[in-house]
Amino acid sequence: MARVKRGVIARARHKKILKAAKGYYGARSRVYRVAFQAVIKAGQYAYRDRRQRKRQFRQLWIARINAAARQNGLSYSKFINGLKKASVEIDRKTLADIAVFDKVAFAALVEKAKSAL
């Protein structure tokens, strides 16, 4: 059986991992073994956090809406319930934007929600 020399393939694989680990601290960017583990772990974190980002933004929007609603004398849950009863279909992202940048429009929405309760 013929001998298989893997030098080229191994070098390419190592280069690929070390390129992905560029900018990491210390041995994580220089030593293949350590860099490989760091790149794998980074991928796991990235996968997990792409999902967490959606949750965290929703939490942020809800916190902002709650704060603005309470300034207008209504809790978050009652405000959302009032909007649903008034058949106002605005998503939380837009509501949070309105709460931060257009307080007058948000106050009008709160009044609409109050009247629907």
Swiss-Prot record:
PROSITE patterns attached to this UniProt entry: RIBOSOMAL_L20 (PS00937)
An example Gene Ontology CC term for this record: ribosome
InterPro entries, per database record: Ribosomal_bL20 (IPR005813), RIBOSOMAL_L20_CS (IPR049946), Ribosomal_protein_bL20_C (IPR035566)
Coiled-coil segments: none
Keywords: Ribonucleoprotein, Ribosomal protein, RNA-binding, rRNA-binding
Biological processes annotated in GO: ribosomal large subunit assembly; translation
GO molecular function: rRNA binding; structural constituent of ribosome
Stated role: Binds directly to 23S ribosomal RNA and is necessary for the in vitro assembly process of the 50S ribosomal subunit. It is not involved in the protein synthesizing functions of that subunit.
HAMAP family in UniProt: Ribosomal_bL20 (MF_00382)
Family statement drawn from the similarity comment of this UniProt entry: Belongs to the bacterial ribosomal protein bL20 family.
Protein name per Swiss-Prot or TrEMBL: Large ribosomal subunit protein bL20
Gene giving rise to this polypeptide: rplT
